[in-house]
């Protein structure tokens, strides 16, 4: 009677190979996912689209120094019938006028109020275009030392709430924070003098790393950089001033022209 010799090693190799094939097949099946669209309409994006502006004077007498006043929270409730035409809006411009703080530290009440404003945005899926200024109907801004002090106070709050800040505007200087009519930084000029340069540098240092900073006039950026070299693809989205600084055109679609937005000192407003 013939004896059948069984090669244990060959059998083991075949079993291992079989198990490997089974595991691979099971793995492929387990990772097979079918995606089906549940919504075909436009969905809101918190960094795109049209904006509205909320702003106001932060008063020492306020129980809470909010720009988003309790009576204005309806603005963020997009299920409200009054907001039917704004269902997909997720951007808002917030203007903080520090009228009562031109010669003193920002109060803890104001800083807490800012924090709570940011939480309201967060709760409703909004982001903001953020600007601070000292006056809306005159050129009476604050002295340089107070501007720098206020930026220093606000810096940790900006960092903490970077997730709901879309972009920051330099602000602080002049009427509306627009860097033109000013009591302390040169009046009716776009010139980047030493005081303005210090404010811009303080803002560059204070803005959260992954957020951008907008200046009112392109000339301010050109003067700060000292050249007109274009931004390269390699440098874009980095934290360098050339990549980080943009500009906001407050005269966009203005009936009176661009109000000197793209001019240089000595040129007419629409040259």
Enumerate the predicted regions with their spans.
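Aromatic-lined substrate-binding rim segments of carbohydrate-active enzymes
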Residues: 70-86, 90-135, 144-147, 207-211
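Positively charged n-region of N-terminal signal peptides that target proteins for export
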Residues: 2-3, 8, 12-15
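An active-site-proximal structural segment forming one wall of the substrate-binding cleft
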Residues: 109-126, 142-169, 192-206
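Sec/Tat signal peptide C-region and signal peptidase I cleavage site
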Residues: 26-30
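Boundary/entry segment of secreted carbohydrate-active catalytic domains
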Residues: 31-90, 95
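Sec-dependent N-terminal signal peptides
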Residues: 15-24
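Short, flexible loop/turn elements at secondary-structure junctions
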Residues: 96-98, 132-136, 158, 172-174, ...
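Catalytic-core regions of glycoside hydrolase
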Residues: 167-271
């Amino acid at each position: 009677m013939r004896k059948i010799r069984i090669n244990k090693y060959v059998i083991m190799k075949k079993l291992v190979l079989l198990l490997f094939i089974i595991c691979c097949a099971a793995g492929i099946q387990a990772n097979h996912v079918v995606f089906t669209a549940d919504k075909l309409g436009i969905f809101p994006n918190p960094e795109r689209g049209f904006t509205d502006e909320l702003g106001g004077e932060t008063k020492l007498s306020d129980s809470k120094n909010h720009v988003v006043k309790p009576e204005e929270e309806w603005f963020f409730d997009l299920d409200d019938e009054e907001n039917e035409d704004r269902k997909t809006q997720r951007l808002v411009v917030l203007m903080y006028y520090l009228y009562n703080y031109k010669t003193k530290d920002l109060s803890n009440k104001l800083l807490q109020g800012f924090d709570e404003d940011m939480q309201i945005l967060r709760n409703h899926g909004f982001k903001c275009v953020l600007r601070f200024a000292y006056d809306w109907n005159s050129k009476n801004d604050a002295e340089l030392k107070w501007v720098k002090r206020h930026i220093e106070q606000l810096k940790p709050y900006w960092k903490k709430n970077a997730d709901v800040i879309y972009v920051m505007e330099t602000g602080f200087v002049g009427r509306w924070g627009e860097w033109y009519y000013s009591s302390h930084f040169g009046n009716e000029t776009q010139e980047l003098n030493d005081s303005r340069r210090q404010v811009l540098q303080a803002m560059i240092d204070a803005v959260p790393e992954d957020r951008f900073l907008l200046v009112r006039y392109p000339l301010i950026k050109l003067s700060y950089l000292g050249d007109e070299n274009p931004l390269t693809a390699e440098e874009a989205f980095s934290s360098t001033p050339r990549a980080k600084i943009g500009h906001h055109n407050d005269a966009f679609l203005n009936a009176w022209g661009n109000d000197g937005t793209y001019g240089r000192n000595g040129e007419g407003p629409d040259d």
